[in-house]
Amino acid sequence: MPWTSDDAERHTHKASTPELKELWAKVANESLERDGDEGRAIREANGVVAREA
């Protein structure tokens, strides 16, 4: 199930702007498609958002 930007706040408090929420969803969905691992996808998205914040 693909994530949306609305899902970002449930997984990281650092996605505080609409742009960061969109970035989180993009990274998480790309990682999920590539690896098929939801946990890894969330961790990767959280890491990218943390670096951008």
Segments the model singles out, each with a brief description of its role:
Residues 1-53:
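C-terminal alpha-helical interaction appendages
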